[in-house]
């Protein structure tokens, strides 16, 4: 029988102790109690923060949204099929971040910044949190530079400035997305970056928009963030915040960016769905009590920031430049009801609205903008000089025409002044029509509006207004290129007005339309 030597035993124990590596890793863990419709109830996670990312088995992540006394309610990001009751999960100590930077331009990404266009991975150099506090009062600057949309009706009557929030509101199929896409196409060559956030739309509709942007060479300066109708409610809820963070990258570096949320009604629906599944008490129209805060904290991040903010943010790399994030949120109404909960909320948050009507759209007036109730609260100070000077009479002419047209249906004999107003209004209405994907320059708008104001249209047949406009613009661009270039800078003077009048008289004499 072999005998054990006590010294050998002590040596073995010493060696074992020396080789033992004790690493203590404290992790805040919890157990999945239930999984229902993308909502997960977790027992434990005592130290979890609101909005913190939670890691589940299989590399799936969620966000903590409900912190209750004995449980945590979390929403899953992506597919929840692999998560089961009894599994463990742990806090990550991080809040949700998305990639930002110029590497994303020309790409289609999901709400987490992952590419979904099949063009390979995105090598973004930086990431940023999706939930950020909006710039304070001191960091802001007043809106005084224009964003040209390229649509006569919008740029003359409801001008939009850099850093403004202008709501596009209307029923389905009234041309809301068309205005937004035209706005993106018109930013080509201006240096304004664009972000198009598609929320809860059909994948085929998003693909169609991307194809149109590519056709018109607008994808190079655009990021598309897509949360389709088949994506979970959590992705539709987060997509606008992700897009906003990508836009803030440019704003805080002294650049200009335009972001379109298409549309926030579907984000509110997704948030309502999440809130009801989390058992939060429902309020008006079953929306949770904080649905106003959902949109206000998102839209307040669209702003014009001053040079001091940009310099501080970039640690002195960018000096003397202001940055801006301009938002065009879209809201879909049901049967023209703008007094519903979400439309009234967003109207009160934004700096004006473009109201689109089904009746006008069906009558062939496109963009189908109601000039009477569409308004821009801050854009007037950002309008270019030439458009501001010339466009004053357009809104009045249209408003008077709508009023008189309703009255003229019942009146049999009208005086000459009323007839003249009706004729003028008819022609201005025709003039405000514009084909999709054909944005106009400042000079082209100025020529058309000047012709309307100075009575050059009164003897042109209403049916021939479209032909008159296209002939006039091709004549001006070919024969008066210098004058057009001067007006494109926004300049306007008596000298320019005189030249413009002479050019229009010469064109009218040719009768070539």
From Swiss-Prot:
<dbReference type="GO" id="GO:0045259">
    <property type="term" value="C:proton-transporting ATP synthase complex"/>
</dbReference>
<keyword id="KW-0547">Nucleotide-binding</keyword>
<dbReference type="Pfam" id="PF02874">
    <property type="entry name" value="ATP-synt_ab_N"/>
</dbReference>
<keyword id="KW-1003">Cell membrane</keyword>
<comment type="function">
    <text>Produces ATP from ADP in the presence of a proton gradient across the membrane. The alpha chain is a regulatory subunit.</text>
</comment>
<dbReference type="GO" id="GO:0005524">
    <property type="term" value="F:ATP binding"/>
</dbReference>
<dbReference type="InterPro" id="IPR038376">
    <property type="entry name" value="ATP_synth_asu_C_sf"/>
</dbReference>
<dbReference type="InterPro" id="IPR005294">
    <property type="entry name" value="ATP_synth_F1_asu"/>
</dbReference>
<keyword id="KW-1278">Translocase</keyword>
<dbReference type="InterPro" id="IPR027417">
    <property type="entry name" value="P-loop_NTPase"/>
</dbReference>
<dbReference type="InterPro" id="IPR036121">
    <property type="entry name" value="ATPase_F1/V1/A1_a/bsu_N_sf"/>
</dbReference>
<dbReference type="Pfam" id="PF00006">
    <property type="entry name" value="ATP-synt_ab"/>
</dbReference>
<dbReference type="InterPro" id="IPR004100">
    <property type="entry name" value="ATPase_F1/V1/A1_a/bsu_N"/>
</dbReference>
<keyword id="KW-0067">ATP-binding</keyword>
<dbReference type="GO" id="GO:0043531">
    <property type="term" value="F:ADP binding"/>
</dbReference>
<dbReference type="Pfam" id="PF00306">
    <property type="entry name" value="ATP-synt_ab_C"/>
</dbReference>
<protein>
    <recommendedName>
        <fullName>ATP synthase subunit alpha</fullName>
        <ecNumber>7.1.2.2</ecNumber>
    </recommendedName>
</protein>
<dbReference type="InterPro" id="IPR033732">
    <property type="entry name" value="ATP_synth_F1_a_nt-bd_dom"/>
</dbReference>
<comment type="subunit">
    <text>F-type ATPases have 2 components, CF(1) - the catalytic core - and CF(0) - the membrane proton channel. CF(1) has five subunits: alpha(3), beta(3), gamma(1), delta(1), epsilon(1). CF(0) has three main subunits: a(1), b(2) and c(9-12). The alpha and beta chains form an alternating ring which encloses part of the gamma chain. CF(1) is attached to CF(0) by a central stalk formed by the gamma and epsilon chains, while a peripheral stalk is formed by the delta and b chains.</text>
</comment>
<keyword id="KW-0375">Hydrogen ion transport</keyword>
<keyword id="KW-0066">ATP synthesis</keyword>
<keyword id="KW-0406">Ion transport</keyword>
<dbReference type="InterPro" id="IPR000793">
    <property type="entry name" value="ATP_synth_asu_C"/>
</dbReference>
<keyword id="KW-0813">Transport</keyword>
<feature type="binding site">
    <location>
        <begin position="170"/>
        <end position="177"/>
    </location>
    <ligand>
        <name>ATP</name>
    </ligand>
</feature>
<keyword id="KW-0139">CF(1)</keyword>
<dbReference type="InterPro" id="IPR000194">
    <property type="entry name" value="ATPase_F1/V1/A1_a/bsu_nucl-bd"/>
</dbReference>
<feature type="site" description="Required for activity">
    <location>
        <position position="374"/>
    </location>
</feature>
<keyword id="KW-0472">Membrane</keyword>
<dbReference type="InterPro" id="IPR023366">
    <property type="entry name" value="ATP_synth_asu-like_sf"/>
</dbReference>
<keyword id="KW-0997">Cell inner membrane</keyword>
<dbReference type="GO" id="GO:0046933">
    <property type="term" value="F:proton-transporting ATP synthase activity, rotational mechanism"/>
</dbReference>
<dbReference type="GO" id="GO:0005886">
    <property type="term" value="C:plasma membrane"/>
</dbReference>
<comment type="similarity">
    <text>Belongs to the ATPase alpha/beta chains family.</text>
</comment>
């Amino acid at each position: 029988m072999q005998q054990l030597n006590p010294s050998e035993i002590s040596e073995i124990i010493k060696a074992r102790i020396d080789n033992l590596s004790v690493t203590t890793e404290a992790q805040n863990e919890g157990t999945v109690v239930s999984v229902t419709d993308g909502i997960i109830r977790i027992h434990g996670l005592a130290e979890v923060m609101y909005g913190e990312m939670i890691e589940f088995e299989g590399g799936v992540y969620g966000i903590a949204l409900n912190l209750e006394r004995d449980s945590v309610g979390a929403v899953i990001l992506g597919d929840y099929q692999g998560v089961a009751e009894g599994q463990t999960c742990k806090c990550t100590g991080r809040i949700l971040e998305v990639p930002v930077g110029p590497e994303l331009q020309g790409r289609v990404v999901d709400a987490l910044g992952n590419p979904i266009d099949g063009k390979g991975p995105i090598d973004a150099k930086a990431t940023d949190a999706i939930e950020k506090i909006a710039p304070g009062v001191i960091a802001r600057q007043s809106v005084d530079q224009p964003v040209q949309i390229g649509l006569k009706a919008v740029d003359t009557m409801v001008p939009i400035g850099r850093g403004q929030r202008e709501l596009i509101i209307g029923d389905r199929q009234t041309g809301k997305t068309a205005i937004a896409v035209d706005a993106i196409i018109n930013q080509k060559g201006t240096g304004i970056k664009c972000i198009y956030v598609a929320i809860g739309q059909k994948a085929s509709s998003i693909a169609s928009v991307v194809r149109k942007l590519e056709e018109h060479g607008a994808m190079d300066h655009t990021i598309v963030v897509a949360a389709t109708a088949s994506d979970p409610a959590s992705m539709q809820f987060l997509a606008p915040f992700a897009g906003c963070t990508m836009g803030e990258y440019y704003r805080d570096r002294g650049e200009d960016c335009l972001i379109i949320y298409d549309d926030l009604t579907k984000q509110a629906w997704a948030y309502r769905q999440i809130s009801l599944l989390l058992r939060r008490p429902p309020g008006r129209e079953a929306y949770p009590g904080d649905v106003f805060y959902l949109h206000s904290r998102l839209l307040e991040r669209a702003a014009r920031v001053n040079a001091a903010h940009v310099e501080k943010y970039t640690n002195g790399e960018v000096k003397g430049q202001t940055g801006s994030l301009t938002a065009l949120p879209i809201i879909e109404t049901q049967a023209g009801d703008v007094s519903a909960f979400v439309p009234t909320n967003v109207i009160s948050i934004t700096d004006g609205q473009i109201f689109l009507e089904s009746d006008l759209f069906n009558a062939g007036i496109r963009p189908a903008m109601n000039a009477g109730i569409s308004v821009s609260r801050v854009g007037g100070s950002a309008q270019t000089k030439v458009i501001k000077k010339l466009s004053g009479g357009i809104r009045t002419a249209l408003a008077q025409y709508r009023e008189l047209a309703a009255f003229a249906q019942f009146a049999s004999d009208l005086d000459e002044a009323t007839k003249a107003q009706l004729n003028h209004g008819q022609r201005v209405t025709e003039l405000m029509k514009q084909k999709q994907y054909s944005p106009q320059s400042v000079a082209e708008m100025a020529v058309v509006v000047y012709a309307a104001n100075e009575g050059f249209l009164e003897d042109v047949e209403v049916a021939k207004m479209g032909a008159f406009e296209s002939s006039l613009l091709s004549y001006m661009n070919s024969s008066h290129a210098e004058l057009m270039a001067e007006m494109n800078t926004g300049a306007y003077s008596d000298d320019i007005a005189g030249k413009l009048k002479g050019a229009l008289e010469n064109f009218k004499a040719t009768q070539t339309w």
